[in-house]
């Protein structure tokens, strides 16, 4: 089995299982309670992992507010296949955990120096190797992935998701064949089914439901 952190994902989904509209607008369809839950889940993580598109769409700083008194600020890990990042983005200009940039398929002439000069650590390797490195070299025991869908799909293809946290917003329906789900746009099936058990079910008065699912590890005997 691969050496990697325990990996959690956290998403808000609509009644019809969408994470955003067809236009990929930022997900602002949930309540303040959902934001509070997001931050509580972040406090469990040694590192946060997002795709570059999600980082830019949601204007994330990938931090935990000081008033929540986090023991640490998690490492901030951002994935871009070609390794292009916007140095004016606030993630490079806010106090927080060290920024780790993963270019999983860099072009031959790739130059990481501008990002290194901005204080980031740049990795050029496949996602599976990056996960191994986070666990073995950076002591990341718990990694929280906050999207987007293509990154979650890549984790699912590696069978590298241990816990799924969802805020199910039953008050909102987006519809649309092209609106993304937690694994992105509709596409081919995963290589194999992944079995999860519902471990937390918490309906709120506002039409939202907090759900947690744990990966069931089937014995391979």
Please report, for each region that a protein language model flagged, where it lies by residue.
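Enzymes that bind and transform nitrogen-containing heteroaromatic metabolites
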Residues: 1-221
